[in-house]
Swiss-Prot record:
One of its GO terms (cellular component) is plasma membrane. May play only a redundant role in maintaining cell wall viability and bacterial virulence. This is Putative glycosyltransferases. Its main location: membrane. It comes from Mycobacterium tuberculosis (strain ATCC 25618 / H37Rv).
Amino acid sequence: MRLSIVTTMYMSEPYVLEFYRRARAAADKITPDVEIIFVDDGSPDAALQQAVSLLDSDPCVRVIQLSRNFGHHKAMMTGLAHATGDLVFLIDSDLEEDPALLEPFYEKLISTGADVVFGCHARRPGGWLRNFGPKIHYRASALLCDPPLHENTLTVRLMTADYVRSLVQHQERELSIAGLWQITGFYQVPMSVNKAWKGTTTYTFRRKVATLVDNVTSFSNKPLVFIFYLGAAIFIISSSAAGYLIIDRIFFRALQAGWASVIVSIWMLGGVTIFCIGLVGIYVSKVFIETKQRPYTIIRRIYGSDLTTREPSSLKTAFPAAHLSNGKRVTSEPEGLATGNR
């Protein structure tokens, strides 16, 4: 059985070497056939140099250097596209998610027969103010996205090769990987994880809002349907009000001047109109970007052996006798991998 560990690097210089040490130790408990893939997402620090230095002592390390910063999600998809393992362990390199999670994730995947075991916050770190934004994000996603996103999911996950191959078939240029994880399907099992928190994050409030907008507009047409019904409701209400005013003016009394109400109505309808046009513009811009068919990342260089022509064997072949016995993992000898084009 071959195991791939995939991680991305951005401002990761303080963590690369320790991440490698922990990841390698966790992988060696499962199989000797390992590859560790670092994807440099245009990191401005020395993370790339540290990762490349590992090649001198471990030929299982591969480093994919992107030509610039493309974003966390696109970097992850690039790493997954180059993974050749029968199982693929995706995890962030900042050590907030411990690489030692690989072993319990592996045991749960084997015991449940799942295609994916993904981490979820057992309890979100930080106070209520820090967690208020994520709660609103997931509530909005549950209301507007189809399918709804699983709440409090983490990057860390263990996946079969069949699932990864299906996942990387998605070719959206504007990636929202949380939605892709969901719509790819397969049998997915959550697992509670106590995630550490180093006190800072590269996901600013602006990035979180942008992520929410991407999630909603990439996987749902509900906002457009909402606009349709909103417009219909405004038309019905305004038509009814106009009819009432005309009848009132003709049969009952003179129409009183109401400049304040007129101005408020104009501003309100103007704001709704601008909002709706902007929302439609987001959808149109996504169509525009997709029609260009640009690659979602560009690789500048790959350090280490390129094994992308090596195809993983099926999970059934990789685990002919793997099972849990009395809570302990029992595995057979790893089998050879099939070869062919991937």
